[in-house]
């Protein structure tokens, strides 16, 4: 039976009544957004954020935050929270994972998307965090004529497909050493990473949207002045972190 949303909803043969209906799909359900748009449900484009995952050796973050060579057996894996304004655009860390892993998070084989997680013991030798910058409505205005209120979704998808293009099959992700990313040079090799599918060297600073690359490079330089050692070629940026929030509401 076709579902009708007014003050009641049919789901199969069951009738649910109420003053409102919450459709809790999760922010990566692009097919649901497109279905609602086709059915005439009002959607509205909104600002969101995109960037990369940045990964350091956990021992390096420990030494920066605890100001000692080793945290010992009693202190937990150190974390951080960073934010700056670069050219009027916000840059910030997101979902920092001490003692954690970078994990694949794509919902389509044609995309490359990464996220992070920490096991309960926070006992990985790596620390990672999302590092993102704000994406404004004006940044995807050029897609509005064709996609309307779904333009942000399409901009997000284009970013993720570029990452897949410069990464590889089987969820291999594009990556670049952090100091190389900031300096605008290629990485001839990559350090070890927690990302199990693997990474390949790539000039993220060249193929990602220019405003994202420039904002992240400036932000990392700022964070390197606040946390001595943060800006280092021992660290990696891995592409891409693009699902911090939904581009529509």
Question: Predicted segment positions?
Answer:
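Residues forming the flavin
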Residues: 2, 6-249
């Amino acid at each position: 039976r076709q579902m009708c949303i007014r003050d009641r909803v049919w789901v199969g043969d069951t009738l649910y009544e109420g003053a409102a209906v919450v459709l809790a799909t999760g922010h990566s359900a692009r097919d649901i957004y497109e279905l609602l748009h086709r059915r005439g449900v009002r959607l509205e484009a909104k600002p969101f954020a995109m960037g990369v995952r940045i990964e350091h050796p956990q021992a390096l973050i420990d030494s920066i935050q605890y100001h000692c060579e080793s945290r010992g057996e009693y202190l937990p894996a150190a974390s951080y929270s960073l934010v700056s304004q670069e050219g009027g655009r916000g840059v910030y860390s997101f979902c920092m994972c001490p003692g954690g892993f970078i994990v694949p998070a794509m919902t389509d084989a044609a995309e490359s998307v990464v996220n992070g997680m920490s096991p309960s013991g926070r006992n990985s030798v790596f620390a990672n965090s999302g590092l993102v910058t704000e994406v404004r409505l004006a940044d995807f205005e050029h897609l509005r004529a064709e996609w309307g209120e779904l333009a942000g979704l399409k901009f997000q998808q284009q970013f993720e497909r570029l990452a897949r293009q410069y990464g590889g099959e089987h969820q291999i992700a594009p990556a670049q050493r952090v100091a190389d990313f900031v300096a605008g040079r290629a990485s001839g090799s990559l350090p070890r990473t927690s990302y199990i599918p693997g990474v390949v060297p790539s000039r993220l600073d060249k193929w990602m949207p220019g405003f994202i690359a420039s904002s992240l490079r400036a932000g990392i330089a700022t964070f390197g002045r606040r946390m001595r050692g943060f800006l280092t070629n021992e660290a990696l940026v891995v592409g891409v972190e693009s699902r911090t929030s939904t581009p529509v509401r």
